[in-house]
Amino acid sequence: MPPKVDPSEKVEVFLRVCGGEAGAMSTLAPKLGPLGVSPKKVGDDIAKATQPWKGMKVSVKLTIQNRIAVPEVLPSASALVIKALKEPPRDRKKEKNIKHNGNIPLEEICKIAKTMRFKSLAVDFKGSVLEILGTAHSVGCKVNGKSPRDIQAGIQSGEIEVVEPK
């Protein structure tokens, strides 16, 4: 039998859930049971925290200390790009492999790049913007009415200047 977990110890658990849904408690139980946390209550907390991300898959970091779980949403770059499109939530059970065809301004891409900077492997901010533009290309949307690939080429050639938002 594994040793008992110290309740005052800080434990972090990472989960991938669909936004706004409580999820299957049976998948949470093996992870949270030994920590002395109720999977049902945690599932409800996660559903509340992920409500703005309804219909999208997002990562959630659960910080558990003294039998209290605090959920923190860690959206991926693609989730931020899709949210910037301001599309209505879709039923993910009925529609699969959705291509998004909206338009995002470059300033919004810069804001997303600033948000994702801590995860980025790029040396400078310009590299982070290029990463987010690649994500926008894979999502299938346009940036300033053009293909994200064209914007990337413009940034690399120096035609388009990228400024970090304050």
Swiss-Prot record:
Any Pfam family hit: Ribosomal_L11
GO cellular component: cytosolic large ribosomal subunit
Alphabetical UniProt keywords: Ribonucleoprotein, Ribosomal protein
InterPro entries: Ribosomal_uL11, Ribosomal_uL11_C, Ribosomal_uL11_C_sf, Ribosomal_uL11_N, Ribosomal_uL11_N_sf
GO biological process per UniProt: translation
Signal peptide: none
Gene Ontology molecular function terms on file: large ribosomal subunit rRNA binding; structural constituent of ribosome
Family classification: Belongs to the universal ribosomal protein uL11 family.
Protein known as: Large ribosomal subunit protein uL11
Upper classification of the organism: Eukaryota, Amoebozoa, Evosea, Eumycetozoa, Dictyostelia
Gene: rpl12
